[in-house]
Regions:
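Short amphipathic alpha-helical segments, especially helix-boundary/capping motifs
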Residues: 21-27, 79-80, 90-94
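Intrinsic-disorder/low-complexity loop/linker signature
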Residues: 24, 33, 75, 139-140, ...
Length: 163
């Protein structure tokens, strides 16, 4: 089993911490360094993303707010993010894998979300951990990849679900 620090260092070769946290959290805690942020994530999601990035050898985009993009809730969702705030205002219980550092939404350069999901199924035996993939939202295939490492022992290596 790989050491935590090695997984963190491998992850940082391909991703900036700004890609996985909100602007508010980054601004408040960036003085504590990258390992502080990474320690808030399940090690399985970090290792799985490194596997995907190195095996596909294609750029992956999670949050892009750092570069002026529109995505800022595709990694850790915290109390500064609108999705969490909106649910709290409605007193709507919500147990998202994003809130507990177990999920990423992402895009892979030059691949559609369906192509990425198909690729993951093809290489499922090589994945370091079991994963869950969101497929459809309100009956339509989503245009991004949602991947999480919530591990229900009743699920297969890759479990697809719709919301």
């Amino acid at each position: 089993m790989m050491e935590t620090k090695q997984i963190y260092d491998d992850f940082l070769q391909y991703f900036n911490v700004e890609e996985i946290v909100s602007p508010g959290i980054y601004e408040k805690y960036n003085h504590l360094g990258d390992y502080f942020f990474l320690s808030r994530f399940d090690i399985r999601i970090l290792a799985t993303m490194v596997f995907i990035r190195t095996t596909l050898n294609k750029a992956i985009t999670i949050n892009d707010w750092l570069w002026g993009g529109r995505f800022d809730e595709r990694g850790l969702r915290d109390t500064s993010t609108p999705m969490v705030q909106d649910r709290a205002k409605k007193n709507d219980p919500w147990l998202s894998a994003h809130v507990v550092g177990m999920a990423f939404d992402f895009d892979v350069k030059e691949m559609t979300a369906n192509e990425v999901r198909e690729w993951l199924f093809k290489f499922r035996d090589c994945l370091p951990y079991k994963i869950r993939l969101e497929r459809k939202l309100n009956g339509e295939f989503i245009s991004w990849v949602h991947l999480d490492v919530c591990d229900d022992p009743r699920n297969p290596k890759i479990y697809s679900f719709d919301v």
